[in-house]
């Protein structure tokens, strides 16, 4: 699936991943390929992006929004 993690200042990550784990106001959530459409508000927490090569990118986010649609996870970090 395609993943983009962006802040107002820069693109933090853009690429392919197998899984994304983040925390919303409703708790931790994991996204895999084919996930149903989703929109949520992020809280301060670590977001982990699992890349196709087996490595993991970690981002400490202060909050923001996450949207999942058409096999794409978009994270707008604050």
Show the residue positions of the predicted features:
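Compact, glycine-rich, soluble single-domain proteins
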Residues: 2-78
